[in-house]
């Protein structure tokens, strides 16, 4: 299925039905009083978070939603029938904003969370409501109210505890395969990851967290180059970023230090808040280095990057160091409440 994470839709709630001016007409009662019923309520439009969905593609092809108007009132004090509501199912993590003003309408963070998008109009009043001691035969009635209508922007941002950050082919997809049940495509060419992948990392019984892998970043990503810029927003909800660095690139012209600095620069250009998010360095593919050089290479990278925070040397392919990494992440997240709980 094609991954769509941003669309524009239009929602039109139904108008309320009109009230009616009617009078009671029965045998032997030639001049009965008013009995005009009220109009029915117009249909409203709701959004409902559904954890079974993972894309907004349905709204790319069906962007307009119109609820029906309420029925008009009738005589004999009969009220018009209210119109059915429309419920739009959306993935958990969808942010809904007003397309014109940018104002936040809803942030669907919980499964089955239901939010009103456009309210249906109230039904009009029948002439029964206007009867008084001075007006025994009122002919007044009111029309139904108009339903609300809006242009909305739907933006899907994945809900994950940990985000993987790195250049194409740094080994992000291999890592998420190694520590979770996720099975993203892995190959020896750039951009094998074309959309975010989520994996549940289970450390112990009842202890787990969610990891997100996005397409790799390249220089110029903040200005729109490559694929990663489009998906950087998916890291905004994470508690921790893992900066994956390939310490043994096949291309000898690639300098891991320069590449790491370029990626951090792109991150800062894109979003200062994301740049300041807690971040650990993960030196991947250490198994490709001679054993007696591995520590020296890591030390050199730490000094060149002036890095004093946490770091790990791993091999996502062989699994070396991955268990220690996941336990460290779990311990870090457990200090930050709330974290993802396994169900």
Swiss-Prot record:
One of its GO terms (molecular function) is GTP binding. GTP binds at residues 166-173, 191-195, 213-216, 284-287, 315-317. PROSITE patterns: G_OBG, GTP1_OBG, OBG. Its EC number is 3.6.5.-. It holds the Pfam family MMR_HSR1. Residues 1-159 form the Obg domain. Keywords: Cytoplasm, GTP-binding, Hydrolase, Magnesium, Metal-binding, Nucleotide-binding. It is found in: Cytoplasm. Its main location: cytoplasm. Residues 160-334 form the OBG-type G domain. One of its GO terms (biological process) is ribosome biogenesis. Mg(2+) binds at residues 173, 193. Its cofactor is Mg(2+). An essential GTPase which binds GTP, GDP and possibly (p)ppGpp with moderate affinity, with high nucleotide exchange rates and a fairly low GTP hydrolysis rate. Plays a role in control of the cell cycle, stress response, ribosome biogenesis and in those bacteria that undergo differentiation, in morphogenesis control. HAMAP family: GTPase_Obg (MF_01454). Belongs to the TRAFAC class OBG-HflX-like GTPase superfamily. OBG GTPase family. Monomer. This is GTPase Obg. The lineage of its organism: Bacteria, Pseudomonadati, Pseudomonadota, Betaproteobacteria, Nitrosomonadales.
């Amino acid at each position: 299925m094609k991954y769509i994470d941003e669309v524009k839709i239009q929602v039109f709630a139904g108008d309320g039905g009109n009230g009616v001016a009617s009078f009671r007409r029965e045998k032997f009662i030639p001049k009965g009083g008013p009995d005009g019923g009220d109009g029915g309520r117009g249909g409203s439009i709701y959004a409902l978070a559904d954890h079974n969905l993972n894309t907004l593609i349905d709204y790319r092809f069906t962007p307009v939603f119109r609820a029906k108007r309420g029925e008009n009132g009738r005589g004999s004090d009969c009220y018009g029938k209210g119109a059915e509501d429309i419920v739009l199912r959306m993935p958990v993590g969808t942010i809904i904003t007003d397309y014109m003003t940018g104002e936040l309408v809803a942030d669907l963070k919980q499964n089955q969370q239901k939010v009103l998008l456009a309210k249906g109009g109230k039904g009009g009043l029948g002439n029964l409501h206007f009867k008084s001691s001075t007006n025994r035969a009122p002919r007044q009635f009111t029309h139904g109210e108009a339903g609300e209508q809006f242009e909305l922007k739907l933006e899907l941002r994945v809900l994950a505890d940990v985000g993987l950050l790195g250049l194409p082919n740094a080994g992000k997809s291999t890592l998420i395969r190694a520590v979770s049940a996720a099975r993203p495509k892995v190959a020896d060419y750039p951009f094998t990851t074309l959309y975010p992948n989520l994996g549940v990392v289970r450390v112990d019984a009842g202890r787990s967290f969610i990891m997100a892998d996005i397409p790799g970043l390249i220089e110029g990503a903040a200005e729109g180059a490559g694929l990663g810029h489009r998906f950087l927003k998916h890291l905004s909800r994470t508690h921790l970023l893992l900066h994956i660095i390939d310490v043994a690139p096949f291309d000898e012209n690639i300098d891991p230090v320069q590449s790491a600095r370029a990626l951090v620069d792109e991150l800062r250009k894109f979003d200062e808040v994301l740049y300041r998010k807690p971040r650990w360095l993960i030196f991947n593919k250490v198994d490709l280095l001679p054993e007696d050089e591995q520590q020296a290479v890591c030390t050199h990278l730490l000094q060149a990057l002036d890095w004093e925070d946490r770091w790990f040397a791993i091999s996502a392919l062989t699994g070396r160091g991955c268990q220690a990494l996941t336990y460290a992440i779990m311990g870090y997240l457990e200090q930050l409440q709330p974290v993802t709980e396994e169900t």
